[in-house]
């Protein structure tokens, strides 16, 4: 009886626990779902990235975007990763009621608020990543309330002020990343108490001005220490010998001085990367730096180091990148460096090295770049160099190399850049037909003899060719005119004969001088005088015969043309011309481009099968410019090389459509950046953009031949690369599509606010008009306001940005009200006012009152020199 009772009791107890846990699990699951929905409700989600977050029995919340669940023992939310979803709004603490949440990643979004202290309620949270947002304000003392955190990443925001001492109370912290912010002051001693720290990143905080604190040497678990591009000065602490776990040390781009501690190298046996470049360090090469045999990257460049490189560097069997350029190193360059099995990059420019490049360089099978300009290397360039099939850059100008180039010099299938100018090389230039990817070849200032190899014409991507100051003879090969040469310099040789016409028309005369036997248009010798005897000796009969033959051929071709045209009257032809080695088919292009787009100008992003991204600009050629003329005009513009001008990589055309193919820029247009996230562009970046655009405009209108005007400058035609370097686009389109089509394009796609007043009645485009458009772009940079956003005046009239600004600055303290309040600070207000004055001068109604581009550049450079760089 007792046994039966016990059995019934056990069953009852089990059922009780079952129903209890079932109810608990059901309650917890519903609670989790509700917390997540409240968390989502606080966001602005313009792309609908979280549209799948809704209450439905068909989709468990553990399967929602960004949600990861863990069994503990049943399924619970443990991680939320909403990286790069264009989210904004407020960060709610409703997720702190998720009892097992350990990981929260909201990086690469647009959250615009102070550091959310309310998340300190998340008592189980171990990782908090808010990097690459618009987080602003200081790090509060209450940061210590995040007691469970192991990872803090607030990098790439607008966090300012001093690093609080209370940060040192987070004893569990393993990763602290505060890089790319606006922090000031010193690194507090409390950071030295974070004994579990593995990663410390305080880089790119230019106002963090102090010596590197010695207490950092106590962090013996530290594997990454990143202090680059900040305001650190003084010496490298000797206490760093205590960082025995360190793998990456980056102190570059600071103001450090003194020597590298002698015991540092032997102590850091786990070191993989050491970068102390661009400081003011001195002394000798750090001894024992390869004692751990793990070093991959060694960057000592742009300092004041001297002495020789020790042969012990041969112990660096893992070394891939050696950068020691721009120092005072001397002595023989270690032979062992040339045969390291993993070495990829050797940069030793601007030192006083001697020695030779040995035949054993062939053992460096991974070698990609050699840059040893301005040293005292000697001997012959070895046959072994041609056996390195990975080599794509060999730059060794201003040395003492002698002898002939080996026949296999250009056998690397990826070789793109060769500069061996200003040496003592001699003999004939070898056949370089294997260098199919050669873009730049400079052999200037040597003693080469013989003729220019005709095979150079087979190098279809060759863009720069400098053969000046040699002893070359013979004719300039006709085939060279088929290349897209941005530079062709054969001055001071012994060349003779007629210069191919297209080469003469696109070259400065100085690139041909010093060849008295050359003749052609614009040269001292006219080739027609050489044929005078032909006319004197009865060549008229031959001329008449040739004319008759030409007429017969022309008649035949005309008949053939009319016949063929009838057959293909309705058949369109696809044509293309590329200046860089990539493949693009009509199918790939038309897959991206909708042919029913309205006339005007559109930009598409095209992804090739290789993964490379291209920008494609669609234009309408309403004038039906001939194929020959179109090619000539695009080639003229494609030859332009300037760091602030977008490269044209090629073009395609079909019927009345033209597609210009540009290099892709990662950060889009200035217009989009200002509209979307203007406060991500601090003043130093905006000033860099202004100066770059002005320099690009001046280059195309004054330095480049033929002189060009932009005629369509606006913020939407200024693109930004990954470093926010401006790239000018869409200039001189009138040369490509013709004036009529260009005017239609401008009227359809450009707001008149960018257009100079005289453009409405003047028949001639001028530099003053470009200056006016540039002034409007300057106003956008200074005010943060889109030029296309008109306001209504007191009388009901529409005011463009120029009129708006001019009216506002007439009010009391109006100039200060005009400046972009999102980035305005005491440190930049004066410079922003100066730039505003330049913008107002550029947008003067009377063209003659506007400054020249040269003057604008000088004024902007004067402002730029006083601005401290701040990372965007």
From Swiss-Prot:
GO cellular component: membrane
Membrane topology (Cytoplasmic): 562-872
Transmembrane segments annotated in the record for this chain: 541-561
Cysteine disulfide links: none
Glycosylated residues, chain numbering: 55, 63, 86, 129, 255, 297, 374, 419, 489
Modified residues (Phosphotyrosine): 662, 699, 754, 761
Extracellular side, ranges: 27-540
Residues modified as Phosphothreonine: 585
Residues that hold ATP according to the record: 595-603, 617
Alphabetical UniProt keywords: ATP-binding, Glycoprotein, Leucine-rich repeat, Membrane, Nucleotide-binding, Phosphoprotein, Receptor, Repeat, Signal, Transferase, Transmembrane, Transmembrane helix
Ranges of the LRR repeats in the UniProt entry: 79-98, 99-122, 123-146, 147-169, 171-193, 195-217, 219-243, 244-267, 269-292, 294-316, 317-340, 341-365, 367-389, 391-412, 413-435, 436-459, 460-482, 484-506
MF terms in GO: ATP binding; protein kinase activity
UniProt entry tagged with the keyword Calcium: no
Membrane topology per record: Single-pass type I membrane protein
Signal sequence annotation: 1-26
Sequence ranges assigned to domain Protein kinase in this UniProt record: 589-863
Annotated compartments: Membrane
Family: Belongs to the protein kinase superfamily. Ser/Thr protein kinase family.
Xref: PANTHER family: LRR RECEPTOR-LIKE SERINE/THREONINE-PROTEIN KINASE-RELATED, PROTEIN KINASE DOMAIN-CONTAINING PROTEIN
Domain remark in the UniProt entry: The protein kinase domain is predicted to be catalytically inactive. Lacks the conserved Asp active site at position 712, which is replaced by an Asn residue.
Protein name according to UniProt: Probably inactive leucine-rich repeat receptor-like protein kinase At5g06940
Organism: Arabidopsis thaliana (Mouse-ear cress)
């Amino acid at each position: 009886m007792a046994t039966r009772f016990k059995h019934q009791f056990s069953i009852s107890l089990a059922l009780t626990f079952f129903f209890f846990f079932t109810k608990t699990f059901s309650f917890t699951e519903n609670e989790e779902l509700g917390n997540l929905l409240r968390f989502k409700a606080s966001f602005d989600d313009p792309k609908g990235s979280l549209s799948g977050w809704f209450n439905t029995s068909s989709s468990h919340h553990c399967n929602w975007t960004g949600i990861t669940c863990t069994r503990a023992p049943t399924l619970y939310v443990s991680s939320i990763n909403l990286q790069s979803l264009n989210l904004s709004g407020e960060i709610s603490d409703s997720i702190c009621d998720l009892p097992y949440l350990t990981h929260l990643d909201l990086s690469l979004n647009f959250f615009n608020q102070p550091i959310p202290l309310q998340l300190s309620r998340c008592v189980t949270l171990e990782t908090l990543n808010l990097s690459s947002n618009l987080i602003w304000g200081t790090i509060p003392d209450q940061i210590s309330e995040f007691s469970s955190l192991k990872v803090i990443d607030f990098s790439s925001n607008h966090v300012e002020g001093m690093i609080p001492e209370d940060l040192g109370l987070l004893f569990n912290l393993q990763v602290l990343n505060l890089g790319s912010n606006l922090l000031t002051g010193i690194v507090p001693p409390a950071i030295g108490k974070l004994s579990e720290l593995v990663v410390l990143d305080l880089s790119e905080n230019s106002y963090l001005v102090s010596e590197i604190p010695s207490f950092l040497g106590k962090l013996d678990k530290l594997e990454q220490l990143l202090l680059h591009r900040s305001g650190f000065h003084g010496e490298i602490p000797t206490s760093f010998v205590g960082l025995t776990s360190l793998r990456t040390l980056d102190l570059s781009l600071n103001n450090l001085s003194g020597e590298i501690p002698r015991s540092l190298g032997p102590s850091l046996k786990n070191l993989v990367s050491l970068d102390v470049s661009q400081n003011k360090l001195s002394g000798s090469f750090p001894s024992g730096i390869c004692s751990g045999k793990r070093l991959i990257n060694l960057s000592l460049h742009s300092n004041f180091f001297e002495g020789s490189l020790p042969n012990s560097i041969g112990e660096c069997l893992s070394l891939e990148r050696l950068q020691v350029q721009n120092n005072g190193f001397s002595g023989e360059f270690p032979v062992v460096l040339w045969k390291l099995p993993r070495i990829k990059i050797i940069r030793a420019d601007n030192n006083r090295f001697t020695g030779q490049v040995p035949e054993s360089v062939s053992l460096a099978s991974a070698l990609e770049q050699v840059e040893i300009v301005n040293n005292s290397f000697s001997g012959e360039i070895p046959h072994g160099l041609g056996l390195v099939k990975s080599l794509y850059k060999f730059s060794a100008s201003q040395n003492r190399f002698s002898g002939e180039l080996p026949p296999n010099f250009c056998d690397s299938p990826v070789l793109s850049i060769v500069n061996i100018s200003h040496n003592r090389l001699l003999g004939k230039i070898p056949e370089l037909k294997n260098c199919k990817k050669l873009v730049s070849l400079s052999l200037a200032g040597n003693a080469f003899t013989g003729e220019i190899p005709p095979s150079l014409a087979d190098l279809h991507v060759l863009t720069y060719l400098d053969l000046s100051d040699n002893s070359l003879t013979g004719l300039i090969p006709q085939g060279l005119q088929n290349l897209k040469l941005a530079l062709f310099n054969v001055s001071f040789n012994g060349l003779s004969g007629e210069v191919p016409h297209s080469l003469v028309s696109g070259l400065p005369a100085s690139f041909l001088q010093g060849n008295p036997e050359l003749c052609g248009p614009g040269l001292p010798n006219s080739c027609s005088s050489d044929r005078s005897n032909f006319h004197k000796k009865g060549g008229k009969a031959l001329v008449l015969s040739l004319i008759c033959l030409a007429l017969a051929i022309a008649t035949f071709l005309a008949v053939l043309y009319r016949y063929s045209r009838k057959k293909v009257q309705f058949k369109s032809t696809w044509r293309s011309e590329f200046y860089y080695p990539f493949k693009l088919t009509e199918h790939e292009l038309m897959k991206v481009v909708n042919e029913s787009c309205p006339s005007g100008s559109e930009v598409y992003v095209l992804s090739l099968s290789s993964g490379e991204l291209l920008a494609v600009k669609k234009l309408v050629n309403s004038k039906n410019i001939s194929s020959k003329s179109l090619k000539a005009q695009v080639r003229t513009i494609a030859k332009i090389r300037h760091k602030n001008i977008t490269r044209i990589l090629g073009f395609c055309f079909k019927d009345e459509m033209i597609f210009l193919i540009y290099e892709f820029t990662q950060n889009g247009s200035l217009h989009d950046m200002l509209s979307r996230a203007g406060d991500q562009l601090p003043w130093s970046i905006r000033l860099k953009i202004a100066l770059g655009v002005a320099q690009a405009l001046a280059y195309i209108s004054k330095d480049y031949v033929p002189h060009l005007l932009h005629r369509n400058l606006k913020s939407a035609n200024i693109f930004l690369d990954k470093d926010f370097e401006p790239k000018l686009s869409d200039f001189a389109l009138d040369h490509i599509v013709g004036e009529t089509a260009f005017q239609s394009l401008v009227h359809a796609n450009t707001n008149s606010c960018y257009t100079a007043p005289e453009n409405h009645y003047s028949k001639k485009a001028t530099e003053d008009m470009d200056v006016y458009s540039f002034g409007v772009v300057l106003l956008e940079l200074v005010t943060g306001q889109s030029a296309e956003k008109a306001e209504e005046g007191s009388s009901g009239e529409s005011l463009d940005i120029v009129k708006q600004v001019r009216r506002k600055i007439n009010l009391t303290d109006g100039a200060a009200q005009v400046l972009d309040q999102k980035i305005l600070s005491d440190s930049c207000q004066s410079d922003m006012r100066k730039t505003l004055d330049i913008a107002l001068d550029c947008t003067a109604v009377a063209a003659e009152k506007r400054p020249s581009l040269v003057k604008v550049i000088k004024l902007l450079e004067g402002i730029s020199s006083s601005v401290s760089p701040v990372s965007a």
